[in-house]
Curated annotation (Swiss-Prot):
One Gene Ontology molecular-function label: tRNA (cytidine(56)-2'-O)-methyltransferase activity
Stretches for region Disordered: 170-218
Catalytic reactions on record: cytidine(56) in tRNA + S-adenosyl-L-methionine = 2'-O-methylcytidine(56) in tRNA + S-adenosyl-L-homocysteine + H(+)
Ranges annotated as spanning the membrane: none
Keywords recorded for this protein, A-Z: Cytoplasm, Methyltransferase, S-adenosyl-L-methionine, Transferase, tRNA processing
Regions of compositional bias (Basic and acidic residues) in chain numbering: 200-218
Quaternary structure, from the entry: Homodimer.
Primary residence: cytoplasm
SUPFAM superfamilies per record: alpha/beta knot (SSF75217)
Protein name: tRNA (cytidine(56)-2'-O)-methyltransferase
């Protein structure tokens, strides 16, 4: 199963923080790719920096200024997260059987076309709340919690779980209980960029080699 998250309706002047959170959740909760519309290089650079420091979990970080075309040319199942949709528990088992899934996460009011193009309009409850929470819950239900235990590829930092306090080590400095650094996750997934449609409309981004001190990710 391959999962991409498409964030549409992003407003660069007001949505940078929450859209970054959508991207971080996509990365940490099992998505293979994150696509932003419209393009906002500052958000994408933040995600690349996290991947550089904490290891690669995303196969693709990209943006498109033609989101409707991106959805129309997606060669797989389209899921739109909306409070007006069907309860997640009523459709998640069926969605889990699909090979390629595009999850649409809206910002401002989502145009009607996306509701019509989606194979599944899925609600994480029918009350107003955060799209970040909706994406996290959807992906966790989709993977049944297994997404939390993937190991990233490469990276510079690892957290060693502790009962109290904080323990962060550089890759290569883990002790016997810290796990092998740079272990490639056994995800059973395709190569980089698989599942991306409308390549002429999507601009991919290589990750820059930045090196910051440990701090908040947003």
């Amino acid at each position: 199963m391959k999962v991409y998250v498409l964030r549409i309706g992003h407003r660069p002047d007001r949505d940078k923080r929450i859209t970054t959170h959508v991207g971080l959740v996509a990365r940490a909760f099992g998505a293979h790719g994150f696509v932003l519309s419209p393009c906002d290089e500052k958000v994408l650079e933040k995600l690349r920096d996290v991947e550089e420091r904490w290891g690669r979990l995303l196969e693709e970080i990209a943006c498109t200024n033609s989101p409707l075309k991106y959805v129309k040319t997606w060669d797989g199942t389209v899921v739109h997260l909306t409070m007006y949709g069907l309860p997640v528990d009523s459709v998640i088992d069926e969605i889990r059987q699909k090979d390629k899934i595009l999850v649409i996460v809206g910002a401002e009011k989502v145009p009607r076309e996306y509701y019509e193009l989606a194979h599944y309009n899925v609600a994480i409850g029918n009350q107003p709340h955060s799209e970040v929470a909706a994406l996290a819950i959807f992906l966790d239900r989709l993977y049944g919690g297994a997404e939390l235990y993937r190991q990233p590829v490469g990276g510079k930092l690892r957290i060693i779980p502790t009962e109290k306090g904080k323990k962060v080590v550089k890759v290569g400095e883990e002790g016997p209980s810290g796990g092998a650094p740079g272990v490639r996750a056994e995800r059973g997934r395709g190569g980089r960029g698989e599942g991306v449609q409308g390549a002429d409309e999507v601009r991919g981004h290589k990750r820059g080699a930045t090196d910051r001190d440990l701090g908040d990710e947003t």
